[in-house]
């Protein structure tokens, strides 16, 4: 089966990962695309092949040369993230549609690759003030980090109109319902 793809992208703190996890836990038709990266694994919190495929820089670059990635990006020097073609195929081989939780750049790249087979969704917070509150409530950001994330959010938000749908995450339960409706509608109208 060559299924459909659901691309969820957003600035940090938008609730994108929470929405994607909810969809994965409640919709058996979809499977999660695990990204590959070159950063160090957080030993106590992450597992290779579950959270990410952790690759060395040399291995990642070799796979780039072999055209094994659907999309990839060097986010910092020597720090790569990407989506392996084999990962998309793995999910399709299970008879499922693929869901992605990726940054804005990756989301646009995936949409460009897959075109009408993919629905790209930009998850948006109602306001910058709300995003700032969410990031502060996480209690994981220094003041400089918070400032940098807010600047990045403004930049990433400038691309929101390039996505098929903008999903405003104001009330989480309502956002879950809307996300399910988006998937159902896309599958019903793109069943070819």
Swiss-Prot record:
Belongs to the guanylate kinase family. Pfam families: Guanylate_kin. Residues 3-184 form the Guanylate kinase-like domain. It is an enzyme of class 2 (transferase). This is Guanylate kinase. Keywords: ATP-binding, Cytoplasm, Kinase, Nucleotide-binding, Transferase. Essential for recycling GMP and indirectly, cGMP. PANTHER family: GUANYLATE KINASE, GUANYLATE KINASE-RELATED. One of its GO terms (cellular component) is cytosol. It catalyses: GMP + ATP = GDP + ADP. PROSITE patterns: GUANYLATE_KINASE_2 (PS50052). SUPFAM superfamilies: P-loop containing nucleoside triphosphate hydrolases. It is found in: Cytoplasm. Its EC number is 2.7.4.8. GO terms for molecular function: ATP binding; guanylate kinase activity. ATP binds at residues 10-17. The gene is gmk. InterPro entries: GK/Ca_channel_bsu, Guanylate_kin-like_dom, Guanylate_kinase, P-loop_NTPase. The keyword Signal does not apply.
């Amino acid at each position: 089966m060559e299924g459909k793809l659901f691309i969820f992208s957003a600035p940090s703190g938008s609730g994108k990962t929470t929405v994607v996890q909810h969809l994965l836990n409640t919709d058996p038709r979809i499977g999660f695309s695990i990204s590959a990266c070159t950063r160090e694994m957080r030993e106590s919190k992450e597992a290779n092949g579950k959270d990410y495929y952790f690759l060395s820089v040399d291995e990642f670059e070799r796979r780039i040369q072999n055209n094994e990635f659907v999309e990839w990006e060097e986010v910092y020097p020597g720090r790569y993230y990407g989506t392996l073609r084999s990962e998309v195929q793995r999910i399709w081989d299970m008879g499922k549609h693929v869901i992605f939780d990726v940054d804005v750049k990756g989301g646009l790249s995936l949409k460009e690759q897959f075109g009408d087979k993919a629905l790209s969704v930009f998850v948006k917070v109602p306001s910058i003030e709300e995003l700032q509150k969410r990031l502060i409530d996480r209690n994981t950001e220094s003041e400089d980090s918070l400032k940098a994330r807010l600047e990045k959010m403004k930049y990433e938000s400038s691309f929101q109109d390039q996505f098929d749908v903008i999903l405003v995450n104001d009330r989480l339960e309502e956002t879950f319902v809307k996300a399910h409706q988006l998937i159902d509608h896309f599958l019903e109208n793109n069943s070819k």
